[in-house]
Curated annotation (Swiss-Prot):
PANTHER family: INDOLE PRENYLTRANSFERASE TDIB-RELATED, PRENYLTRANSFERASE ASQH1-RELATED. It comes from the Eukaryota. Keywords: Transferase. Belongs to the tryptophan dimethylallyltransferase family. Coiled coil: none annotated. This is Prenyltransferase nscD. The gene is nscD. It comes from Arthroderma gypseum (strain ATCC MYA-4604 / CBS 118893). Its EC number is 2.5.1.-. GO terms for molecular function: prenyltransferase activity. Pfam families: Trp_DMAT. It is an enzyme of class 2 (transferase). Prenyltransferase; part of the gene cluster that mediates the biosynthesis of neosartoricin B, a prenylated anthracenone that probably exhibits T-cell antiproliferative activity, suggestive of a physiological role as an immunosuppressive agent. The non-reducing polyketide synthase nscA probably synthesizes and cyclizes the decaketide backbone. The hydrolase nscB then mediates the product release through hydrolysis followed by spontaneous decarboxylation. The prenyltransferase nscD catalyzes the addition of the dimethylallyl group to the aromatic C5.
Length: 436
């Protein structure tokens, strides 16, 4: 793989810090550098984003690994992840847009995983406040208004211990032709009753508090009605996860995440079109169906009304397939956008085969700029033989419809803990990490 001269030049003049930060910088800094290099980011933008990553992300990743077992299992990356507090996304380019790179982190601090911070909120809120003070485009008005509505009101100690875990994540998008870093926050209600009240009580009140009593809730109400009255929409289940943009109030979006266990493509297309309310051409739906079947290892001739074949775990039990979506709510728009997530972490298709299927799709339809660059990134982060034979590098592909084409994003993991001993073996059997 080609060298990374910009990463090397930036690293040369960085001050020495503790071994934890040195570890995370050498590992994740190189990952970020590789992604920007392959995506064709301008050199000055690469330097800017690398410095942001070093000083505004790396210090929040906590202690470096000392075994293959995480001291705190982060929920970043979902079921495919190994507990590492960071993962990445690569939004494929279009004919007129370069790929966009993001990372997602669960900030870890001195109070993480202690009784003082059961929901791991302290480090995240401190990081968001720091971003608001140093990034001129970051505005936390919506976040600070929404956060109290999502925080559980738990009194009993046993309940708090049972529901402890991540309640906040942070995403940072580094567009190639921008001078800003766009920040997103993700909130996770920990109490099941909160999730059931999300569309009827929590979100309407939070949006009125944020935007004013006269805020237009047409888009939110459409989602609620679709999930209540539509035969297809009523099969959706709220996860409780809500994403918001940390920017000026008039530009913010609220993303509501749901899942379905119906895997027929007729059902998937009905959700993408909101039961016909969002027109999507037959050509694009056909493209999505082909990609859906290929990534899920389903035969191409499977009728669109049929469920995907059940997937079997190594122990012989069945692995249920869950399909996530999100609805993109904006008060100024009456109709929400919809995005589907294709989980490849449990698919019978290997990570490398899945990645190549997406690249073939993009090349066949003339989408994206140099999609092969994405394969270079994956093969730099994870050896080819592991991409061919093991799972865990890839988490999801998301698919939306933008400007009459499929807008595809890949979410993938650095596998810091899972590959810990593999690196030791590579160093001639020495009992230390290859990252040391």
């Amino acid at each position: 793989m080609a060298s990374l001269p910009i990463f090397d030049s930036v690293s040369r003049f960085l001050p020495l810090t503790n071994e934890d930060e040195q570890f995370w910088w050498r590992l994740t800094g190189q990952h970020m550098a590789r992604m920007m290099h392959e995506a064709g980011y301008p050199e000055d933008r690469q330097v800017e984003c690398l410095l942001f990553h070093r000083f505004k992300v790396v210090p929040c990743l906590g202690p470096r690994p000392h075994s293959d077992i995480p001291w705190y299992k982060s929920r970043v990356g979902g079921g495919a992840a190994d507990g590492c507090p960071i993962n990445y996304s690569w939004r494929f380019g279009t004919a007129d847009r370069k790929p966009h790179i993001r990372n997602f982190i669960e900030p870890l601090g001195t109070l993480t995983n202690t009784p003082a911070d059961r929901l791991n909120e302290v480090a995240t809120k401190a990081l968001l406040q720091d971003y608001a003070m140093t990034l001129p485009n970051v505005d936390l008005e919506l976040f600070w208004t929404f956060a109290p509505h999502y925080r559980p009101r738990i009194i009993e100690k046993a309940d708090m211990e049972k529901l402890a875990g991540a309640s906040l994540l942070v995403g940072a998008e580094m567009s190639p032709d921008s001078r800003t870093i766009d920040i997103k926050a993700y909130m996770y209600p920990r109490v099941p009753s909160q999730t059931s009240q999300l569309l009827t009580t929590i979100l309407p009140q939070a949006m009125r508090d944020a935007y004013g009593e006269d805020v237009c809730l047409d888009s939110l109400n459409l989602v609620r009605d679709f999930m209540t009255s539509d035969p297809q929409g009523s099969q959706l289940t709220l996860t409780g996860t809500t994403g918001i943009d940390c920017c000026k109030l008039q530009d913010t979006r609220v993303k509501i995440y749901v899942i379905t266990r119906n895997t027929s493509f007729d059902h998937i297309s009905a959700i993408m079109t909101l039961g016909g309310r969002r027109p999507i051409s037959k050509e694009l739906l056909s493209q999505l169906q082909t990609l859906w079947y290929e990534l899920k290892g389903a035969p191409a001739e499977l009728p669109s009304s049929e469920q995907l074949p059940a997937q079997t775990k190594p122990d012989g039990s069945k692995n249920p397939i869950v399909v996530p979506f999100y609805f993109d709510i904006q008060p100024r728009l009456a109709l929400p956008d919809v995005k589907a997530y294709i989980d490849v972490s449990t698919s019978p298709v290997s990570d490398l085969a899945a990645a190549k299927a997406v690249v073939r799709h993009l090349e066949h339809h003339g989408s994206g700029q140099n999609p092969q660059a994405y394969l270079n990134v994956l093969q730099d982060i994870t050896p080819v033989e592991e991409l061919e034979t093991q799972k865990g590098a890839l988490a999801f592909y998301s698919v939306a419809v933008k400007k009459n084409e499929l807008d595809i994003t890949s979410y993938f993991n650095p596998q810091v803990y899972k590959r810990y001993f593999a690196h030791e073996v590579q160093l001639n059997g020495q009992r230390r990490s290859a990252f040391e």
